[in-house]
Amino acid sequence: MGDIEKGKKIFVQKCSQCHTVEKGGKHKTGPNLDGLFGRKTGQAEGFSYTDANKNKGITWGEDTLMEYLENPKKYIPGTKMIFAGIKKKSERADLIAYLKDATSK
């Protein structure tokens, strides 16, 4: 399990420009991530996803996020997420720990 505080810093630096995590938070360029864990790809209500995201058909969890966040465009070809990914596994683990905590409140 990663470090939540380190993960929060990574989120602020790399993700918060396009995503929010708080319950009832607005969609930005990317969807609000509240309730992310256990939700299928392309299912955040009120966000316009690509067909690639809607049709991927996986459920978000630690393992799927670990793979996705390494290289989003490889994991979901056709996604509109313009993020290159996080190559360091420890940084992905920290971010996932933060997301698990922040999106389930």
From Swiss-Prot:
Keywords, ordered alphabetically: Acetylation, Electron transport, Heme, Iron, Metal-binding, Mitochondrion, Respiratory chain, Transport
Entries under InterPro entries matching the protein: Cyt_c-like_dom, Cyt_c-like_dom_sf, Cyt_c_1A/1B
Family to which the UniProt record says this protein belongs: Belongs to the cytochrome c family.
Name of the featured protein: Cytochrome c
Primary localisation category: mitochondrion
UniProt KW Oxidoreductase keyword: no
Cellular location(s): Mitochondrion intermembrane space
Post-translational modification summary for this protein: Binds 1 heme c group covalently per subunit.
Gene Ontology cellular-component terms listed: mitochondrial intermembrane space
Entry-linked Pfam families: Cytochrom_C
GO molecular function terms noted in the UniProt entry: electron transfer activity; heme binding; metal ion binding
Modified positions (N-acetylglycine) in chain numbering: G2
Record's function text: Electron carrier protein. The oxidized form of the cytochrome c heme group can accept an electron from the heme group of the cytochrome c1 subunit of cytochrome reductase. Cytochrome c then transfers this electron to the cytochrome oxidase complex, the final protein carrier in the mitochondrial electron-transport chain.
List of residues binding heme c: C15, C18, H19, M81
Organism: Struthio camelus
